[in-house]
């Protein structure tokens, strides 16, 4: 599975508050280590009852660090009200993390794309259109012109159930 191929799985606080994800590998035959669960939470709003607060988790904040359940909370430099993503990756690298799956949400994905920190993307697309009522998978990138948009090369594509899965590599 996708999660099992990474050292860490990252989400933003919006995903934690909306979905309370476990961020674990749930394959029946998986007996390897679980990826480190990483949350970007600049204002420390992660509930003590959240699944990510139960351990094997790192919560990055720009606020004064305080305990949240069994999760480790790390204070990093502020970048416009959010955790500095380079500082986050430096901490993860120092802990042996070499591969991070950014699983959600759109603001986190946009931040990593804006900072040119994405090597590869994998995503599923359903054959439905939601328009502006839907959730965006990538928030605003604040591009001055189309030429500034991050560019990717399609490496793989496959129909999975009724959805389309793609793997893209940064050019």
Annotated model-derived regions:
Residues 3-4, 53, 93, 113-114, ...:
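Alpha-helix boundary recognition
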Residues 35, 97-99, 118-120, 163-165:
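Active-site lining segments that contact anionic ligands and/or coordinate catalytic metals
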Residues 115-152:
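Flexible, gly/pro- and Lys/Arg-enriched active-site loops
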Residues 1-99, 107-110:
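Active-site ligand-binding patch in enzyme domains
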Residues 105-111, 128-129:
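Small/polar glycine-rich anion-binding or flexible loop at a beta-alpha turn
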Residues 43, 63-65, 79, 127, ...:
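Short, solvent-exposed coil/turn elements at secondary-structure transition points
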Residues 140-171:
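Conserved histidine-centered catalytic loops in small-molecule metabolism enzymes
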């Amino acid at each position: 599975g996708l999660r099992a191929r990474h050292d860490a799985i990252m989400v933003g606080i919006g995903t934690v508050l909306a979905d309370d994800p476990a961020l674990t590998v749930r394959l029946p035959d998986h007996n390897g280590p679980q990826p480190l669960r990483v949350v970007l939470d600049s204002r420390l709003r992660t509930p003590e009852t959240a699944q990510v607060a139960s351990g094997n988790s790192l919560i990055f904040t720009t606020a004064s660090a305080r305990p949240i359940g069994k999760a480790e909370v790390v204070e990093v430099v502020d970048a416009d009200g959010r955790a500095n993503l380079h500082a986050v990756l430096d901490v993860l690298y120092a802990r042996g993390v070499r591969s991070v799956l950014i699983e959600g949400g759109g603001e986190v994905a946009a931040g990593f794309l804006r900072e040119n920190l994405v090597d590869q993307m994998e995503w599923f697309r359903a054959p439905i259109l939601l328009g502006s009522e839907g959730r965006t998978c990538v928030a605003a990138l604040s591009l001055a012109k189309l030429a500034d948009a991050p560019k990717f090369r399609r490496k793989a594509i496959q129909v999975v159930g009724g959805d389309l899965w793609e793997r893209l590599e940064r050019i």
